[in-house]
């Protein structure tokens, strides 16, 4: 049912938008018809369809990242941003937009615009991921590693604030727009790269269900069964870091999906069996992201709402409910 819901929402995102296109024409374009309006064809194939697929993949990616991090750190509030990966990505973008004037030059190689932002976001996120990956070999305690991640995030945020203070008004505005998040940055020509890396990482995460099922019983129990918990933690850090870097670089920092969706999946399935919980989390994350994306384009005449204005409306009540349920 969840899979059918995801497909239905994907089609809804393709059929509906700021420009009113007849349903028959949309369907004809999707089926390869050539007798439709050229501008409508461009809107569907170059904008709406890539945006819907991006929302589908990003929702699943960030949600499964949150689920795996919550399992590894045994912390229900762990999510991709808690390790400082999103902040590292934001720092990379801030350096390009606010310090380097929107472009990067390395020797004879120079590039600007979206390419510079994409490269900076990805490099920033992966540098933090590599830092956490390196520290995970030194720090044995998951709690201490979590604290280091939080402090890394605070440090990155502090540098970003300083850059904002000294930057131009145009630079600050550009950075704020990127920070609001959106799924429209992945155009049709960028989608294959985004989709390929996302799908490979999602398949890798599905392959981790058995060790995750053992890990949830406790690290000592997992070690007794022959699970190398440190190696498992490193693999999860690498996969979540890569997914977070990818989605943040292309879409900006998307809030609450990685934190809230795993709990929504647990509430619906009422199980901690990762064989069903992990695939369900990916599907529910995709559904929530598509719903949020659809909500963003509803006020078509007034423009598109930033995705981060909608995701907390979904995520915050879930977290509040979980916290209250544990204390009542």
Would you name each region that the model predicts?
Residues 1-328:
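Alpha-helical transmembrane segments in inner-membrane proteins
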